[in-house]
Amino acid sequence: MTEYDSPWKEALDRYFQSFLALCFRELHDAVDWSVPPRMLDKELQRIAPQNDVGLRTVDKLVEVCLLSGGTEWLLIHLEVQSQPATAFAKRMFVYYYRIIDKYDRPLVSLAVLGDEEQNWRPNRFERESYGCRIDFAFPTVKLLDYLSQIEELEQSENPFATVILAHLMTRQTAGNPLDRCQWKLRLLRPMYARGMSAEDVRSLFRVLDWMMELPTDIAIEFERELLKIEQENQMPYVTSIERRAAEQGLEQGLEQGLEQGLIVGQIELLQRLLGHVETSREDLLGVPLDQLAQQRDQLQGELETTRKND
């Protein structure tokens, strides 16, 4: 699975009910949500075609209980590649019959198309030869269609609306990191205003951060604005300093001890945010852990004071 696919997997795992409510409402309303869905990804991996390895897809197999009293397996095949795949409908059919053949369970196949080709809308696989016919139809949702519903998505309380917006704006701002930065902040602000739980904010932030990647110089400006948002709302949910520090200090953390590596990364980022001359990484790694923590705390206090005076 590629880096771009990872946020989709996390979003579907955490917000599966919200996903169905937004994208496949009829099916959502037939599910008994008092019974938690079961993620069956391991079962799906056992029957996945070998030639699917490396494709930019996210596949989910989920068991849900229905209000009618039965159970249903849902195959969700999410296509996130930028170009249409000519064999997509066939792949949907192959997954369908492999699951039916191995598990013999009621099954619904759903497709989410994340490409940018307006006219590419596969929803059927057909084959016919001398009176023998296959006609396999499956529901699809085209994320591109939501471009006409940006305002509605921004106002929606459904967390998956933010995921779709992040996907759309990532593609709309390709090659324009400043616009992407503004959209990223625009999507983050309502999370605090709506009083979302800290866990939900962190989860959605990870999805946005994965999708809406920024170059280093603009990422630093993004961090500045994010700190302001956190301070204004008195809700430091994202802990952005620690998040970026984890990225910057991971290598050192593995070699020198995770805690030391993370603190070094925090100090480096704080020095940049404050405009200080940066201490070399080699020098920082030679400082005892307790002194590093003290230096980090002093810089954090200086940054907070600076923000209050702005």
Report residues per predicted region.
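Elongated, amphipathic alpha-helical interaction scaffolds
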Residues: M1-D310
